[in-house]
Amino acid sequence: IDYDRHMYDGYNWTYINLPVEDIKPLAIASIKDSTAMYFSCDVAKFLDSKKGTLDLRNYDYESLMGTTFGMDKKQRIQTFASGSSHAMTLVGVDLDEKGMPKKWLIENSWGATSGYKGFLIMTDDWFDEYMFRLVVEKKYVPQNILDILRQKPTLLPAWDPMFAEDK
């Protein structure tokens, strides 16, 4: 993304766009090795800040409004209905008996009075819908994915819908 950097004359970030099912094992490996990760998401969607949960079942908007909300993640991004709005630190995961994630633990920057002592719990299906960016150390990434970084990146304009909300 053009101008997506945090210092004058710095480098733009380089992203690898992966399916969420390929991202989760990288995050799990990092957490199992006690390595936290930069994580960005659309934090306001289905957030219960008092309970400290990010869960698609927190609010029943469909019954309240008498309609369904049928857009998938791609459609929400393309119409600017969803985007990366807040960065936090991904620090934990709760796995089921098959090693699949059920929920994730995030350390937030809003202080100890927000969420549960400054932490949020995000369900795995919320992760699928509203996680946008995860920075994982290269040692957790398979070589076939790292090889993608050798390709010439496509520079997207600053107004690209993928990161238009990212401020």
Model-inferred region functions:
Residues 1-167:
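Active-site signature of cysteine proteases
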